[in-house]
Amino acid sequence: MRPLVATVDLTALRHNYLLAKQCAPQRKAFAVVKANAYGHGAPEAVTALREIADGFAVACLEEAEVIRGCAPEARILLLEGCFEPSEYLRAAELGLDIAVQDARQADWLLAADLARPLNVWLKLDSGMHRLGFSVDGLRECHARLKGAAQVGELNLISHFACADERGHALTETQLERYAELLELPFEHCSLANSAAVLTLPQAHMAWIRPGIMLYGATPFAELSARELGLKPVMTLTGALIAVRDVPVGESVGYGASWVAQRPSRIGTVSCGYADGYPRTAPSGTSVVIHGQRVPLAGRVSMDMLAVDLTDLPQAQLGDAVELWGAQMPIDELAQACGTIGYELLTKVTGRVPRRYIG
């Protein structure tokens, strides 16, 4: 079997969820498990959390069906609502909470003959300009849906654009726009994503929505996961499958972009961009062998990457290589590649086996 595995620590996942709850005492928390729990495996993540989680949030009906199979009694929120009229019938059968973000979705809901009322979360476009009603539009929709037979709870939800940039002016603007609607009779309100859970207590409302923090990555550029008390959930581990000596002046990898400046010892690692390791990782990016960092040498290939072992003479064939995890934070790798931890986690491909511990 190819020596590459993503080890998922479910104890760390539970720790991070409980940390989110500690940040917002007396609030409830939707664990955001969309995109296959950010690449970690939604069924396994939900099973690990279902005894402590107040609810789960996903992007679409197909994801909700998976979650319902793992957590028959859990509250499950469709963050983007339904994409066609027939989905409302299935949402009612599954007992979902749904976002309603425009007049078309409201029309579909009011026209539906449902087995049971749906808990509705009216989505405010408070400044991100992606989904949601304007302040006035939401007031109008609230009036339309209040008391409708298809509606159980009527709740309020919005999403921050810049909460991960502390002190950004737009965050205060979004809070103010959200506050304009709190005079309306809502059962529950939700606003805080991971960044706001960690640093904006005024945004916590009745329900928080921790996402990336559940998986042990930071939403901030300037605050590490360790500083925030988060534990990494996924460790991506390959192995040295070849070791060779490369003389001065010889190159390594596609494009001959890395050239040996000294007699070098080069290791080949069983991981590449087809596994989800970023091709954009530059030479010098660290991996960890025997607890010591060694740098990438040359371009990442589809199935392999090369590392410079010259300063780690004890490294040998078969040694484990941590691509990211507790010793090599995923956020550090993401920053080196000009991206974010979210993207790397969700891009770990299906050919990488997941191993669950805890």
From Swiss-Prot:
Q: What InterPro entries does the entry give? A: Ala_racemase, Ala_racemase/Decarboxylase_C, Ala_racemase_C, Ala_racemase_N, Ala_racemase_pyridoxalP-BS, PLP-binding_barrel
UniProt key word Chaperone: no
Cite the entry's keywords alphabetically: Isomerase, Pyridoxal phosphate
- For the modification N6-(pyridoxal phosphate)lysine, the affected residues are 34
Q: What Pfam families has UniProt attached to this entry?
A: Ala_racemase_C, Ala_racemase_N
Presence of keyword Metal-binding: no
Query: According to its UniProt record, which residues of this chain constitute the active site?
Result: 34 (proton acceptor), 254 (proton acceptor)
Q: In which pathway does it act?
A: Amino-acid biosynthesis; D-alanine biosynthesis; D-alanine from L-alanine: step 1/1
Q: Function of this protein?
A: Catalyzes the interconversion of L-alanine and D-alanine. May also act on other amino acids.
**What is the protein name given in its UniProt record?**
Alanine racemase
Q: Which gene encodes it?
A: alr
